[in-house]
């Protein structure tokens, strides 16, 4: 009876010894893994890197860098010249083309354009349920009079 109760204790002790041997003993060629892990944890605190320029000067320099706005209708680009020629070939005159280009380029700059975000609403005016605000738009007419 005494031998059977000692057997688990011996097995536990042998397992613990094996575990300690694996952890503390030399691993592969690189050496003791546990010691290396502990040394990494206790490693020297990295010192602050010396920089040639002050933070203020660097931010001032980087703040001045702005990406150039991409100009879609830049006439020096060959594809724009090709578009222009195609528009003229399709029958658009130069003044109409310039007018259209100016309209689309300046569309969002002048507040409430008629076809901007305020006046034109895309919903069915003959639908059973109208717009959410009754005062906003007329509802139920078969013609959207706001567009005429």
Curated annotation (Swiss-Prot):
It is found in: Secreted; Cytoplasm; Apical cell membrane. Induction: Decreased expression in the choroid plexus after penetrating injury in the central nervous system. Expressed in the brain, with expression in the choroid plexus and the ventricular ependymal cells (at protein level). Keywords: Cell membrane, Cleavage on pair of basic residues, Cytoplasm, Membrane, Secreted, Signal. InterPro entries: Augurin. It comes from the Eukaryota. Belongs to the augurin family. This is Augurin. Probable hormone that may attenuate cell proliferation and induce senescence of oligodendrocyte and neural precursor cells in the central nervous system. ECRG4-induced senescence is characterized by G1 arrest, RB1 dephosphorylation and accelerated CCND1 and CCND3 proteasomal degradation. GO terms for cellular component: apical plasma membrane; dense core granule; extracellular space. Its main location: secreted. Residues 1-31 form the signal peptide. One of its GO terms (biological process) is anaphase-promoting complex-dependent catabolic process. Residues 32-68, 133-148 form a propeptide.
């Amino acid at each position: 009876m005494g031998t059977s109760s000692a057997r688990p204790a011996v097995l536990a002790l042998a397992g613990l010894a094996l575990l300690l041997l694996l952890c503390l003993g030399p691993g592969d060629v690189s050496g003791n893994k546990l010691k290396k892990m502990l040394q990494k944890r206790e490693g020297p605190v990295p010192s602050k890197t010396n920089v040639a320029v002050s933070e203020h000067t660097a931010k001032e320099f980087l703040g001045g860098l702005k990406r150039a706005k991409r100009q879609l209708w830049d006439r020096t680009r060959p594809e724009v010249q090709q578009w222009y020629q195609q528009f003229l070939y399709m029958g658009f005159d130069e003044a109409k083309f310039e007018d259209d280009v100016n309209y689309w380029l300046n569309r969002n700059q002048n507040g409430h354009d008629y076809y901007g975000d305020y006046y034109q609403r895309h919903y069915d005016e003959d639908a059973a349920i109208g717009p959410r605000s009754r005062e906003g738009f007329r509802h139920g007419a078969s013609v959207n009079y706001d567009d005429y």
